[in-house]
Amino acid sequence: MALPIDPAAIDPDEYGEQQTTLAMDHDEAIERVREVCLDNGFGIAVEFSPSELLNAKVDADRDPYYVLGACNPAMADRALDATDGRIGALFPCNVIIWEEAPGQQRVYHLSIMKIARLLGLPTAADEMDDIIADTGEMVEAVFAELDAD
């Protein structure tokens, strides 16, 4: 299948890639990321462990991998308005924690707001730019705090 764009040509900043590494065990990292998200204006709307699910259902033997579905309701409400509701297909803003090695956890995030813009979902471009700036500041604060650990 030929893609209409070359993914390698897109700067990671255009889709809001953020990542860091935490030197702690997996469960501690999940708790730390949850705490930092809450401290910076995000609630956790949903969370689950794909590794536990896959290991149980298809004997995948995956290392620990966890999804925290972060959400700031005010931002989500604005984004729904700015996209005529279509951004809901991307909700929530996921923060992923996976074990790279014992005692070493990768924390990873992509901006659904920036991805929505790349996909052409916004019907209110100026408002979406404001939402991207606002949520970007919040996510940067999360990763700055995690980087300080």
Protein language model regions, located:
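Acidic, polar-rich N-terminal leader regions of halophilic archaeal proteins
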Residues: M1-D149
